[in-house]
Amino acid sequence: MLEFTLHKTSGHARRGTLRLNHGTIETPVFMPVGTYGAVKAMTPDRLDETGAQIILGNTFHLWLRPGLDVIGTFGGLHDFTGWHKPILTDSGGFQVFSLGDLRKITEEGVHFQSPINGDKLFLSPEKSMEIQTVLNSDIVMQLDECTPGQVDHATAKASMQMSLRWAERSRRAFDDYRNPNALFGIVQGNLYLDLREESLKGLTDIGFDGIAVGGLSVGEPKPEMYRVLREVGPMLPADKPHYLMGVGTPEDLVEGVANGIDMFDCVMPTRNARNGWLFTRWGDVKIKNARYKDDTRPLDEQCSCYTCRHFSRGYLHHLHRTGEITGAMLNTVHNLHYYQELMADMRAAIEADSFAGFQQEFHAQRARGA
């Protein structure tokens, strides 16, 4: 089930609600990534406290470990993981295509060797829909092919057209499995506007509950990513949620929302947290730097997260330098809270029809330095 309601716009920025089988989401929204069914260094209650409304699970990795038999025993990911709010799962395609020489792409699907034990496996649109039906994720993604950041037009066109054929097969299999959740199609076409338009038209003809923009933030220059976003964003259907996959930095999120994107996911806040790279409204803090060893201030004096309420930069510096797992946990709490607060601030700015002013203030603050 999916019901999307658009409440307000400010320029191209959109404020909406997305009703799913496991809850209602306020958009625009950021989805923390729980690759193996857990957001790294977080428990579900801590994740909830950051303001997270929905998380992402990885179809490829969950299929390999623990496997469908195990997750099926629990009736899906929600009871297995203890996260009872909505979950989106990707199709598994990106991970398979990242295997390089270990995989072979055909019209039928992708043959590959398991990176865990070397088993020969096959992922098709139908198999991806089967896996995601067992996972019982609230939002299911079609299987698509993601090209590298910059390829020639002919290569991008052939890949995009195969993704469209896979989209049709994904739609058919999703319906055959009587999956009660929502299915999103994925716009591909690399950096070429004509291919993106052809892809979007094909997906619209097939019929999906939401539309994702894929194939960005995969190695192309940032100005090119923003160009495609500015061209494609306003073309997306107004009555469906728009999802920008695998993006990104705080600046990327603001740029995405400015161009009509409603949903984002990225490993950046959690991965960077474990590496001591912390986001604040005043710019980024690399907590390993010696300048923070006796800094008594919190990361951000205006942040209300557990980490900023209780701990100093000096203590976080110490935890990172000594490799304490508590440091990774506290850093992750802060980064995810920062991302969720950023989304809440954008929702409020759209409601007040002041998003352009918010953008200016956001960039000015981030440039100031922490």
UniProtKB/Swiss-Prot annotation:
Keywords of the record: Glycosyltransferase, Metal-binding, Queuosine biosynthesis, Transferase, tRNA processing, Zinc
Residues binding substrate: 90-94, 144, 188, 215
Molecular-function GO terms, alphabetical: metal ion binding; tRNA-guanosine(34) queuine transglycosylase activity
Enzyme Commission designation: 2.4.2.29
Pathway: tRNA modification; tRNA-queuosine biosynthesis
Highest taxon listed in the record's lineage: Bacteria
Cofactor binding summary note: Binds 1 zinc ion per subunit.
Annotated catalysed reactions: 7-aminomethyl-7-carbaguanine + guanosine(34) in tRNA = 7-aminomethyl-7-carbaguanosine(34) in tRNA + guanine
Active-site residues from the entry: 90, 265
Region (RNA binding): 246-252, 270-274
Cellular component aspect of the GO annotation: cytosol
Top EC class, one word: transferase
Cofactor(s) this protein cannot do without: Zn(2+)
A Pfam cross-reference name: TGT
One GO term (biological process): tRNA wobble guanine modification
Sites where the protein binds Zn(2+): 303, 305, 308, 334
Biological role: Catalyzes the base-exchange of a guanine (G) residue with the queuine precursor 7-aminomethyl-7-deazaguanine (PreQ1) at position 34 (anticodon wobble position) in tRNAs with GU(N) anticodons (tRNA-Asp, -Asn, -His and -Tyr). Catalysis occurs through a double-displacement mechanism. The nucleophile active site attacks the C1' of nucleotide 34 to detach the guanine base from the RNA, forming a covalent enzyme-RNA intermediate. The proton acceptor active site deprotonates the incoming PreQ1, allowing a nucleophilic attack on the C1' of the ribose to form the product.
Subunit structure: Homodimer. Within each dimer, one monomer is responsible for RNA recognition and catalysis, while the other monomer binds to the replacement base PreQ1.
Family classification: Belongs to the queuine tRNA-ribosyltransferase family.
Protein name: Queuine tRNA-ribosyltransferase
